[in-house]
Amino acid sequence: MINKNKVTERSGIHDTVKSLSENLRKYIEAQYHIRDEGLIAERRALLQQNETIAQAPYIEATPIYEPGAPYSELPIPEAASNVLTQLSELGIGLYQRPYKHQSQALESFLGEDASDLVIATGTGSGKTESFLMPIIGKLAIESSERPKSASLPGCRAILLYPMNALVNDQLARIRRLFGDSEASKILRSGRCAPVRFGAYTGRTPYPGRRSSRRDELFIKPLFDEFYNKLANNAPVRAELNRIGRWPSKDLDAFYGQSASQAKTYVSGKKTGKQFVLNNWGERLITQPEDRELMTRHEMQNRCPELLITNYSMLEYMLMRPIERNIFEQTKEWLKADEMNELILVLDEAHMYRGAGGAEVALLIRRLCARLDIPRERMRCILTSASLGSIEDGERFAQDLTGLSPTSSRKFRIIEGTRESRPESQIVTSKEANALAEFDLNSFQCVAEDLESAYAAIESLAERMGWQKPMIKDHSTLRNWLFDNLTGFGPIETLIEIVSGKAVKLNILSENLFPDSPQQIAERATDALLALGCYAQRASDGRVLIPTRMHLFYRGLPGLYACIDPDCNQRLGNHSGPTILGRLYTKPLDQCKCASKGRVYELFTHRDCGAAFIRGYVSSEMDFVWHQPNGPLSEDEDIDLVPIDILVEETPHVHSDYQDRWLHIATGRLSKQCQDEDSGYRKVFIPDRVKSGSEITFDECPVCMRKTRSAQNEPSKIMDHVTKGEAPFTTLVRTQISHQPASRPIDGKHPNGGKKVLIFSDGRQKAARLARDIPRDIELDLFRQSIALACSKLKDINREPKPTSVLYLAFLSVLSEHDLLIFDGEDSRKVVMARDEFYRDYNSDLAQAFDDNFSPQESPSRYKIALLKLLCSNYYSLSGTTVGFVEPSQLKSKKMWEDVQSKKLNIESKDVHALAVAWIDTLLTEFAFDESIDSTLRIKAAGFYKPTWGSQGRFGKALRKTLIQHPAMGELYVEVLEEIFRTHLTLGKDGVYFLAPNALRLKIDLLHVWKQCNDCTALMPFALEHSTCLACGSNSVKTVEPSESSYINARKGFWRSPVEEVLVSNSRLLNLSVEEHTAQLSHRDRASVHATTELYELRFQDVLINDNDKPIDVLSCTTTMEVGVDIGSLVAVALRNVPPQRENYQQRAGRAGRRGASVSTVVTYSQNGPHDSYYFLNPERIVAGSPRTPEVKVNNPKIARRHVHSFLVQTFFHELMEQGIYNPTEKTAILEKALGTTRDFFHGAKDTGLNLDSFNNWVKNRILSTNGDLRTSVAAWLPPVLETGGLSASDWFAKVAEEFLNTLHGLAEIVPQIAALVDEENEDDEQTSGGMKFAQEELLEFLFYHGLLPSYAFPTSLCSFLVEKIVKNIRGSFEVRTVQQPQQSISQALSEYAPGRLIVIDRKTYRSGGVFSNALKGELNRARKLFNNPKKFIHCDKCSFVRDPHNNQNSENTCPICGGILKVEIMIQPEVFGPENAKELNEDDREQEITYVTAAQYPQPVDPEDFKFNNGGAHIVFTHAIDQKLVTVNRGKNEGGSSGFSVCCECGAASVYDSYSPAKGAHERPYKYIATKETPRLCSGEYKRVFLGHDFRTDLLLLRITVGSPLVTDTSNAIVLRMYEDALYTIAEALRLAASRHKQLDLDPAEFGSGFRILPTIEEDTQALDLFLYDTLSGGAGYAEVAAANLDDILTATLALLEGCECDTSCTDCLNHFHNQHIQSRLDRKLGASLLRYALYGMVPRCASPDIQVEKLSQLRASLELDGFQCLIKGTQEAPMIVSLNDRSVAVGSYPGLIDRPDFQHDVYKSKNTNAHIAFNEYLLRSNLPQAHQNIRKLLR
């Protein structure tokens, strides 16, 4: 089934750039319909401008580093150089000549300096080898010099990673090196056992003590379902070995299947029956030659030399007794010889910044303490591509690893040395022409057709005078190219320009070929880059110039049009008449054209493309605004309502409209007919105007179609904001189609190994892309396939009827192109039918028909796709002008016979035309094929109808025209319709469906179409050449598809792909897309791979199961979640601009490492300000320098938690090692989790491992004057720790005492009755199935209460639980977890809220349940939440919230604004579940989106007892410890009530609907196996609740007190809103300024900020609180540091607010990725004014007259547009005078914060004017239309 056709869409990078831009443009033109050809041309000119939707591309090459000396020549011990030399000869990743920086690393680490290392080299520089080689060297030296020590167990190196995904990636690399059997022999020399390694993470099987039962549960399935299954599959096993995904051990011997014995029961009920005795005690034993340890128990017995783990697991390992053997063995090994040193590798070290970095820094110090060694005996190697300068890197490394600056041990920063290259040379014209004429297309097909590529190379070699290559294979050709290109002038110039730098592509071409014409320079650049990327040295795999291209795209943020048809500023060169002027992408008041035409937003009708402008009018409707009025007004509101105004030249004669005349320069609207010379133009408004509501057309006044398909549906008169995922899909498809294949195309690899890795910020976005991209592609692919199927049928003289005939031809197309389509069961059915067709007929379609072969019934998705292709408005054959549906030949003949017999006076061609129109009418009603189920019809149509079918009549407008036709009449029409119904339909009771066998599809791209000038409809035929078959008008023109700009713009996007397969014989391309996020990482411990890992393998074309197919596109979140290094990857796509440049560079760096072609990095920007900023300034993100990481080890809050951890760990380990307790059934949980919480607080009398013993132990060992632990702990605490003036020893004692007090306090909340703990369901890093008491294990209890290190991870997590009921091995049914993604509760309250759609693994669920983390078998899982609900007391009108835990006050009036206080029930979710516990039907995509509030600081009932410090004239501050914040999702406020309806038994939940509250029996949101005693449905009562979460953290609290002359009356809505905006602004600026302070230098995400307005205590004063808090629950100590540096921070805050030129806020000052939801509230000038008052007592004053005039400038422009005259007087009494006719008004402005009664503006003293008015500047900015209306009222 291999298709020999090459993909035609291949060529150079300039063509790729052009195609990406063109395809995005075509998509926008096709989806956002415009009718007028002049307007089409104008939009195209705008789209083709640089920076509208595409940014200039940048080219960048990964730098290549200088090779160093061979190992034998390095000044390192001979033992190390010998081993490294031997290993380098094995071809396992170490090369015989390391890079120079790798040599330097070896010399520094192993040589006389014995320095610790920071490997600070870039991507692709061999960082991994840079730390593995020193480890190998140390192992070799130990073997040679200390053989006795070498035989001892103990970790020689710990490799620490931030995430499991990176552990998996590193494990794969280590397997390839240390796991190689030959390498192991070399490393083993001088040792009694192989050097072993092991990964110890949450996924390592299995936690807890080993037992036969648990081996059966957790180990047996790993082997039975994976390892043993693949043992005989040599190719797959070899591939897994190659990529490091197969364990380096003797799996057969380790599993020991032969130890199991068949036995027979000799007594009891089962006497005589056989069973298997597994003898697990004799199995799972490490084999003598094993290099890898794969279970926890292996590593606990004898720890590996290399331990790979993550820092959170290392924390658990230090704490838990079960792992103590690992550290004891290492400790003994270290003691055995003073030359022994532990190596600690911190890969991706730049990630350890901020709170997480401080946590890891203290963990490292505790590790040293646990091993009882000084820091100097721990050798550290840090790696990072982004650590800033040498000094910064050194300081960071010392702080992180605890190395004192005065230590004899030093850090050496290893930086890459760029390789020295031959000098670049001036390119000759001969070289430029030879490169430009190089056959790049053939060369790009090298993976599929080596001979053609070789011929292209041979021709180039001849022209260049190079010796011809001898063709052998790809490797030989690549090596030959490498040799010949090295030293070649153009390539050396290229390397010099782009190595390690980003250069614009056009500048690159000019610099490379300055004397060549542009076209030649571009082609030569394409060839040079392609050759340089393909060239690869065989000896070490070095690519000559690994290159990537950075491309930035975005959609349109909207279109805004000048209303002057004669505008002289138009971008397009369209010479004919048009209906509007220049188009813009931003809102403007006026165009710059000669007439200064007004600019309004452009809307068009989706069906016909008719153009409208969106304006806003008052009830007088005499002036059109371009923007709505704001929400606030000092006077009576004059509401403006939206209006759609038609700007087409002629509406349809039968439509309803009113004529109006719009003044081009001002926007005045007149009912009176105006002369053309008067500056007016004619427009049309809706006929019926309803007061107070949107003024829009019910039917389009051009095409007469309804503008809404249903009452609640959005209008089809739509804006031009590019929406959805489809534009991004278009870019990804283009990106992959232009990518050269990396392997031959065959049945298993239909896309030739092409891959794209997609990154999104957000797991749900990544999941949605994985679901939606295949669906976006599917319909286009189906259209192409059906077009080819029709062509095939035509070739064998078969009619393409939409029956099984078409389905068989469709299968033939799939077979010929090795194509997969659809997914799930539908895909399986198609594959089975396709394979049967291939097997029986070798894909010969004619033969299959001759044999009357009939495939099985087509699957559901085929039927849905066929309905869409025939019936949908926009994507059907006729809708895309690809073809149409007509009667079959036989039916045409029979209908003509009937027409003649009825003596109807009509020509046969008109019967055919009417038949096609009649068929089309029925198709638009989806009345096709009665046998198709109504559920499929609903999915295809996208809407519900209770009954489907048609009356079998012409469309209403056409029927009316036909009846009025002189030669026809009503009877005539009815006879014609009856003939059509008889021959073309099946039906009964007056409901008809088109019969598939009576129809045929006509695919004809050359067909000449007809278009109606009145209604714009496109149709294949017209009646009598001139009558429109849609509306019946007699104004039809002929449209030639190849010449029509309208068809090209509107339909070209869909026509072109069909043309490519029919005319150009292109290969069909489908993409397999899967999600790859942490939410898929839940793994049943019985399976080897989580879903993500399986997808990674398929993305690497490793197909484990027979039915596996390669994944082409992997949709991920962050790079840290991609645990695979796909070196050959050449395409990355970013769905949005990442938050920081390091993120971008890391993601982009995934492409172009070792690929064979130029890599592309495509970024699609959102319309948000953060994305726009980097879209317009790509050089800042592509090549900007990363931030220097800092780790703040002086943070006492974090140190306190590590002290707690050390105390608990030491207490338990000491007592357990002393063996003072008797082993009991609880020993396992004691070893694994420090026992149960209840035992520690209320029991454990037998073991002494309880709070009383701990209390005594702390007092004896620490608090007493001779406590021995005081000094040892003080030794590992950072010297810079902020201890409040205490010595380290005294601070430690103080912390220990406070810890005891905290534990005694917590003892009161721990229940004393113990629950049974099922150890099988427990794990450390994974969520348990749920327990009666939430933190049953002591370790989890201490973590939950924030007493142990959290590593900046949220401790309050929520999960979304997807379950299924399955039959277990015992044959009974049980509930199993399918997926259980987790998020912090603050995120989950928005993303998992009831009503939200959740996409997991391409399945869509609607959140519909909120319950507790209960056991799976529990029936009523929500009861616990309702047993302990909280109260939420808040005001609807303002931000006031009262402490829910302190609600004695019964006052129900808001003390801030006077509104009514509401008391709501608030529950805190633990688990969310899907509606009805199942995924949604495909057609159900409705969701209700609600959001969680920012953290709010509830008001106490009693006065707070804070000791404030003075911070300025009107501001005080304090550092408030352990304050409670609350964050709430209030649902939607509709109908006066908000919140969610939640069942108090099962937790079934939905957004509260006051009109139809949830009630009655309902499905549970989780799986439950019903018994006879329990009904299937839950009948619990629904309650209306808020979903919320409160948490404690530390605050920096600032209190501003405002008084006269500033406004203080917060009961006034304007005053309240103004203060809230000012506080939003200062809070955001404060957060940014604090995070940038030199003592903090944090990611702003580690700080949160907020505000609250306090109740007024004194008259005419108002207190305003701002707070800055640690986002880490329990606090990270940053608020304390901020308080200590508040003067600097407040100065920086004010500078940030005043140091920008924008009006309110922008990306240069306040706007960024994370605050997009509040940017409308940010006003830097207002915030600065309030902060300046608070700090310095400066009262806002009226500005000078000229600045007032500047503030009034927008109002002035608006008034002048409306015909008023504005005179700039420039005096205090009259900054501006506005006049009309003989009346005038003096106008000024004043700061909004000034209180009106205490303030009189000078305009009120003005003379010689009829009136005066002063505007509040805050209101002026937010409600300009209102100010305009106020002036109008004064002058008219």
From Swiss-Prot:
One of its GO terms (biological process) is defense response to virus. One of its GO terms (molecular function) is ATP binding. Keywords: Antiviral defense, ATP-binding, Cytoplasm, Helicase, Hydrolase, Nucleotide-binding. ATP binds at T121, G122, T123, G124, S125, G126, K127, T128. Residues 108-405 form the Helicase ATP-binding domain. It is found in: Cytoplasm. Disruption phenotype: When this gene is missing the Druantia system does not confer resistance to SECphi27 in E.coli. Residues 1014-1199 form the Helicase C-terminal domain. Its main location: cytoplasm. One of its GO terms (cellular component) is cytoplasm. A motif (DEAH box) lies at residues 347-350. It comes from the Bacteria. PANTHER family: ATP-DEPENDENT HELICASE HRQ1. Component of antiviral defense system Druantia type I, composed of DruA, DruB, DruC, DruD and DruE. Expression of Druantia in E.coli (strain MG1655) confers resistance to phage lambda, SECphi18, SECphi27 and T4. This protein is probably a helicase. This is Druantia protein DruE. It comes from Escherichia coli (strain UMEA 4076-1).
